Amino acid sequence: MKKVYQGKTKDVFELDNGNYLLKFKDDVTGKDGVFDPGENSVGLSIDGIGRANLETSVKFFEILNNAGIKTHYVSANLEEATMEVLPAKVFGNGLEVICRYRAVGSFLRRYGSCVEEGAKLDCYVEATLKDNDRCDPLITSEGLEALNIMTQAQFDSMKSMTQKISNIVRDTIAEKGLELYDIKFEFGFYNDEVILIDEIASGNMRVYKDGVIVDPMDLTALLLDK
């Protein structure tokens, strides 16, 4: 088993069968020791968050697969905090796609002169390039096409999937009395189709209860009835 990529919250290994293995770590993105899924660097470590993120991911991947939505998920080993996935090809050097229901985080930092904190957004989708040196810059569908990263048809498919998946996650957590403010995904290309890759983890979403943000570990416990 060969390590092919070292990420902020996961390491990636190539398996003999051609698939990949994701090893979840106890690191989360944030700043000054405060959790923030919108940051592009590791801000703190939380004991057990790697397994927690994996458990949450497995729950949602199985929901999506049952709904007929294509993902890279194959299987998981909770004890080892690993997940086997299909070898999907990333777009460019990687894209992150954010779906927003409320104005918080980097959206508020960018557009705070035009919108109040917590204002409702209608399943707003935006994409960023994975580029730590440039702080994960925003990019439009036209920009992605001009740079030969993604076609307009692929972008449209990705956007539609993002909204569909986000609504499934939103409705699922609403059953626990929780509200999804925003969530981050990654997509890849496999068998000529755009599919969801990476994870659907507590550390990749902002969830609130009674107007207060829910800690990722607490969120996992609520979602998994622990």
Name each region found by the language model.
Residues M1-L129:
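Active-site loop/lid in soluble adenylation, ligation, and acyl-transfer enzymes
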Residues N19, G92-G94, G177-L180, N191:
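Coil-to-beta-strand transition motifs
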Residues P37-A52, R134-M161:
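Short histidine-centered catalytic/ligand-binding loop motif
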Residues H72-E79, A174-F189:
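A short glycine-rich, hydrophobically flanked beta-strand micro-motif that places a catalytic Asp/Glu
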Residues C99, L180-E199:
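Conserved metal-phosphate-binding beta-hairpin within the catalytic cores
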Residues R109, C114, I200-K226:
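C-terminal helix-cap and adjacent tail motif
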Residues C123-C135, S166-E179, S202-M205:
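Phosphate-binding core of ATP-grasp and ATP-grasp-like enzymes
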Residues I149-Y181:
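A long amphipathic alpha-helix within ATP-dependent nucleotide-binding catalytic cores
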